[in-house]
């Protein structure tokens, strides 16, 4: 019986301390030292080719790669399998066929006269006399 109250007191002592949700590793070691960023920088850097040549970057690249564009311009475009030509001919053919379809579609609905669709309305003639729209179009 004496043992039970002692264990309750001991349990309360352990649970009364608020524990942090996240534990930071090596917290005691990092707390006192200042942060040092120099360790993140590279110790030695590779010297660039233009620095070795003693030129600025732009002139070095111009000197090195100037001939590439001239060489590409002098060589004719080579289409070994004729894909480009086939593509352009297919595009031209598609455009012509779409124009032909459009003309066929238009020809179905073309009317010889505008007044063919308008029929005389007897009610309109009774109220207004001759149909004014048909009279104006004729």
Curated annotation (Swiss-Prot):
Q: What is its EC number?
A: 2.1.1.-
Q: Does the keyword RNA-binding apply?
A: no
Entry's Gene Ontology BP terms: methylation; rRNA processing
Please verify whether the record's keywords include Transit peptide.
Answer: yes
Reactions mediated catalytically: a guanosine in 21S rRNA + S-adenosyl-L-methionine = a 2'-O-methylguanosine in 21S rRNA + S-adenosyl-L-homocysteine + H(+)
Q: Give the stretch annotated as transit peptide in the record, renumbered to this chain.
A: 1-21
Q: Where is this region: Disordered?
A: 92-113
Major enzyme class: transferase
Q: Name one GO cellular component term.
A: mitochondrion
According to the UniProt entry, its GO molecular function terms are:
methyltransferase activity
Q: Where in the cell is it found?
A: Mitochondrion
Q: Any idea which UniProt keywords this protein has? A: Methyltransferase, Mitochondrion, rRNA processing, S-adenosyl-L-methionine, Transferase, Transit peptide
Q: Give the record's family classification.
A: Belongs to the class IV-like SAM-binding methyltransferase superfamily. RNA methyltransferase TrmH family.
Describe its function: S-adenosyl-L-methionine-dependent 2'-O-ribose methyltransferase that catalyzes the formation of the 2'-O-methylguanosine corresponding to position 2270 in S.cerevisiae 21S mitochondrial large ribosomal RNA, a universally conserved modification in the peptidyl transferase domain of the 21S rRNA.
Protein name listed in UniProt: rRNA methyltransferase 1, mitochondrial
What's the source species for this entry? Answer: Lachancea kluyveri (strain ATCC 58438 / CBS 3082 / BCRC 21498 / NBRC 1685 / JCM 7257 / NCYC 543 / NRRL Y-12651) (Yeast)
